Design a protein with these regions (language model features):
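Ribonuclease/tRNase effector modules and their secretory precursors
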Residues: 1-110
Length: 110
């Protein structure tokens, strides 16, 4: 199991996702990695605060990171996520820290 302290940020994750890092530092917190899912050539690490860190499996570098919505949570846990994580994801969404898939569709981003 990976730990967040053992990972390093890529340029993309550190500079281009600085807005997300600020929200995580100020409001959500980093937490601990509770699940690792391997697909598309990299690990998607879920933390207990509702974050997903996309990590390169060979170099242990964080490629990108995002805050989960409920749709992604159910995908990661095969429609059986733990209750505490559902509550945390709902808390993040209700505070506006997550742009949900539906909101992105309305804004024309997808």
């Amino acid at each position: 199991m990976l730990t967040i302290s053992s990972l390093t940020f890529s340029y993309h994750a550190q500079v281009e996702r600085a807005d997300r890092i600020a929200i995580i530092d100020n409001h959500i917190g980093w937490g601990q990695i509770v699940k690792e899912v391997y697909f598309s050539g990299c690990y998607h690490c879920v933390t207990d605060t509702g974050l997903v860190l996309v990590v390169d499996d060979t170099r242990r570098i964080i490629i990108t990171l995002y805050i989960m919505d409920r749709r992604k949570l159910h995908q990661m846990y095969n429609n059986r996520p733990p209750k505490y994580l559902i509550n945390k994801v709902d808390f993040n969404v209700n505070h506006g820290w997550v742009q949900t898939y539906r909101a992105a569709m309305r804004a024309g981003l997808i």
